[in-house]
Amino acid sequence: MLKIIPNKKDIGAEIVCDLKKLSKVDFRRIKSALHKYGVIFFKKQNLTSSSYINFAKNFGKLANYPRLKGLSKKYPQITVVQRKSSDKGPSFGEQFHTDSIYTKKPPRFTMLLSKLVPKKGAANTEFCSQYLAFRNLPINIKKKLELVKGIYSSEGPISITTKERVKEKGKKIKELISTHKIFKKINLNYAIYCSPGHFMDFKPKIKHQLRLKKFLLKHQIKKKFQYSLEWEKNQLAIWDNRSMLHQATPFKGNRIMHRITIH
């Protein structure tokens, strides 16, 4: 029987079930929990690539990630995020961000399935609730941000963390730039939709925009909005890119994750 266990402050939830044996009612509950908590995770899920793909399709159309090659010709939508103990420099995604916001149609959801992880407590993924960030935003700041969009680039601050991985297993692409509204309405709730790792500027330009930019990017990642996920082998996490920021944490060791993004 499916069981939902919310984390403190309702930032994320663990769901206890077997992903290979789900009813239609179970799927509805999982989707509802994802919208409510922003990120959900499932332990002890020994999924094949085929079953992983089939599960992901329940959430929408699978996307192709523009910066890394797929797992294989059969599974191009699964990208491998790997770090070796010999790797130097920052981990892939080691700055708060939301995935592929620099595209015209960014993915709504991201899935990560752990295949190989270092010791417990290392290589966590940190999440930051943008529902809470929006609720705690001063009214005068909300009014200013309602009038502008954010400009985002694939060559933003976080791009330094992708260069080594792209060099190894990726493909060169031209800089991608897109603009999006700062706020998103998801069901009945609002969230800040701004990726610190890709943010370049506001459009149109506004008075005191540098000060506003610094305030916004600092506000979004306050500790009181955060949850740190400890990975175990064969653990699956799904998060809503519209309501959650995430980042990798620094670590040494070997890790292999299989990633899917969904429109």
Q: Where do the PLM segments sit?
A:
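Non-heme Fe(II) oxygenase catalytic core, chiefly the N-lobe of the double-stranded beta-helix
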Residues: L2-K233, R242-H263
